[in-house]
Design a protein with these regions (language model features):
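Cys-dependent protein tyrosine phosphatase-like superfamily
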Residues: 10, 15-174, 187-286
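Ser/Thr-glycine-rich phosphate-binding loops at phosphate-binding pockets of nucleotides
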Residues: 179, 183-184
Length: 286
């Protein structure tokens, strides 16, 4: 085969795979009209060829803006548990609207919102920060705290307790923070890792937040610009409202360097036993 033709064929296959993954990720979005980043984790394949069941595991942003139709949709979808990773102040500002019949679990990862994802735009602008990388750099500190702080580890262990309790078919756990990207993203990494989902899939799920929240972020940035935000402020707002590959790469590297990898973290810091991991896979995998 001609080398040029071979390279062209390889490129075509790569594009097809990437397109297939994009379509798959778009299909993960739930039909919620008044919330953002509502995503089904069912359908992802594990390393050994099993598949996460639908109607079992859902990652979202907060539930504060849901209307009655959204609540009915989630009730019909089978939502049984809502795990809220936000701080007390965040919850008081924007309390969740919980579907009828679902149990609400207040499970704060931090005592305050270190990701800044819920701070009002006026507060962000009032910081008068000239460093356009301040928001980007701040996120690495926030992720370190998610991994290492005792409060975060307790919260994520409680999250696993809820996952283990959700043993009825077609009953879902919603887990969320404010934007559904950082605290929720780390929770998704832990849960998907425990279920045996490949790291490449976990990364793509994490990064899909940007596509899922494009309209919201653009609107947020436009409002900031209209209110006179500097270029540095706009850069920081964007970095606080989106995800970067470097964030999840940092998480994975930190887990490897400090704990020997995510599997060891699940056993040693989450205190998940082999029996509990087997139970999780029985509950959530086909």
């Amino acid at each position: 085969m001609d080398i040029a033709l071979l390279l062209k064929w390889i490129l075509c296959q790569k594009v097809r795979v990437e397109n297939a993954m994009t379509i798959k990720l778009e299909n993960q979005l739930l039909n919620i009209k008044n919330g953002r980043n509502f995503r089904e984790l069912g359908g992802y394949q594990t390393k050994d060829g099993k598949t996460i069941k639908k109607h079992k595991l859902i990652r979202t942003a907060n539930l504060a803006s849901l209307d009655e139709n959204d609540l009915k949709y989630l009730q019909d979808y089978g939502v049984k548990y809502v795990v809220d990773f936000r701080s007390k102040d965040e919850v008081e500002r924007e309390p969740d609207r919980v579907p009828e019949g679902a149990t609400y679990d207040f499970d704060p990862v931090f005592s305050e919102d270190l990701t800044d994802s819920s701070k009002g735009i006026d507060e962000v602008l009032s910081q008068d920060n000239k460093d356009p990388k301040a928001g980007y750099n701040h996120m690495f500190i926030a992720y370190d705290d998610m991994i290492k702080s005792e409060s975060a580890q307790r919260a994520y262990r409680k999250f696993f307790d809820v996952l283990l309790a959700n043993d009825e078919e077609n009953r879902s756990v919603i887990f969320h923070c404010t934007a559904g990207k950082d605290r929720t993203g780390f929770a998704a990494l832990l849960a998907l890792s425990a279920l045996g989902v490949p790291l490449d899939t976990i990364k793509q799920d994490y990064l899909f937040t940007n596509a899922a929240t494009t309209d919201f972020v653009n609107s947020f940035l436009q409002k900031a610009k209209d209110e006179g935000a500097s270029d540095a402020n706009l850069s920081n707002i964007k970095d606080l409202q989106t995800v970067h590959p470097e964030y999840i790469d940092h998480v994975i590297e930190t887990l490897q360097q400090n704990y020997g990898g995510v599997e060891n973290y699940l056993h040693d810091m989450m205190k998940l036993t082999d029996e509990e991991i087997s139970k999780l896979r029985k509950i959530y995998l086909n």
